[in-house]
């Protein structure tokens, strides 16, 4: 396995705004939540929306469900052991058992939640086509892809009942590299550089193809830079348009040097960021080894893993 560059995988997690006066966690009352364990990842949501004190609930590490194409399961042993070492109970279900349509897979997740109220995370393995095909849901006139519907199980609200992620792999090599990166990031992230997690990179572009030209991408990015420095980061690199149009010559060295977080806000699509430019082809010039940052890309289609541009920006990173 070539570890010259460890690819970042973006766990595409479904976020929902908790709106209204009747927000509930899986339809539970506060009395029910205080009388039984709850999955650890939902602790803050439960406390904030039920006005429950930390001493009144019993959050515990829950169940980590993996659903994978049948031919992938034999390669998951080390990753399953790793998740067990983090305190998770891990269940692995073959895609042939879960069902080969999105609606059937959602029913499998719902049945698992009914059997195991400590279900916390669901990990889907595979792209929507190709080597490890794994279906998803599509929305709107542009047929945008999203796994969020898998998380809407109980009630008619938009609140996720589980957290979900997808490893959009196109080969066994992709899978091996992603699993190695994930385990190394948790077990010994500072092995090769003791300071890299205290550095960050913020990229932004104030651009529009019509007036008025937005100003908030750079404004919010200046705010984020200050927030990170106040939080304890030692160095935040910035690459902004204007004045920089060709961003890759500045972005690549910053990432190769090691940064814990990369954030972009501006103008882009599945090909990557356009102002300043950093596209899927530029990813091949990254040589950051085990120093794999968390990427945030707040622009249309950069995470569209079903786009005709394949791999999309996030998949290539």
Regions found by a protein language model. Name each.
Residues 21-317:
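Cysteine-dependent hydrolase recognition
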Residues 1-4, 148:
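Generic cytosolic/nucleocytoplasmic N-terminal low-complexity/intrinsically disordered segments
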Residues 3-16:
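Sec-dependent N-terminal signal peptides
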């Amino acid at each position: 396995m070539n570890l010259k560059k460890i690819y970042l995988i973006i766990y595409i997690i479904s976020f929902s705004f908790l709106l209204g006066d009747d927000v509930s966690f899986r339809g539970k009352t506060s009395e029910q939540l205080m009388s039984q364990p709850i999955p650890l990842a939902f602790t803050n949501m439960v406390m904030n929306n039920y006005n429950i004190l930390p001493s009144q609930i019993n959050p515990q590490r829950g169940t980590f469900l993996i659903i994978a194409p049948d031919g992938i399961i034999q390669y998951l042993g080390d990753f399953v052991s790793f998740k067990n070492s983090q305190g998770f109970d891990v269940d692995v279900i073959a895609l042939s058992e879960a069902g080969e349509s999105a609606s059937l897979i959602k029913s499998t997740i719902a049945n698992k939640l009914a059997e195991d109220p400590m279900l916390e995370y669901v990990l889907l393995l595979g792209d929507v086509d190709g080597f490890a095909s794994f279906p998803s849901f599509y929305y709107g006139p542009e047929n945008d892809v999203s796994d969020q519907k898998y998380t809407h199980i109980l009630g008619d609200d938009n609140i996720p009942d589980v957290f979900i992620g997808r490893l959009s792999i196109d080969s066994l090599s992709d899978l091996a590299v992603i699993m190695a990166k994930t385990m190394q990031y948790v077990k010994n992230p500072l092995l090769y550089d003791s300071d890299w997690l205290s550095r960050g990179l913020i990229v932004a572009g104030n651009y529009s193809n019509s007036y008025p030209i937005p100003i908030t991408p750079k404004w919010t990015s200046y705010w984020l830079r200050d927030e990170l420095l106040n939080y304890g980061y030692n160095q935040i690199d910035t690459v902004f348009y204007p004045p920089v149009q060709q961003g890759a010559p500045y972005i690549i060295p910053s990432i190769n040097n090691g940064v814990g977080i990369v954030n972009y806000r501006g103008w882009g699509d599945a090909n990557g960021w356009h102002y300043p430019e950093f596209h899927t082809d530029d990813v091949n010039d990254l040589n950051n080894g085990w120093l794999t940052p968390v990427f945030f890309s707040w622009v249309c289609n950069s995470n569209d893993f079903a786009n005709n541009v394949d791999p999309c920006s996030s998949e290539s990173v």
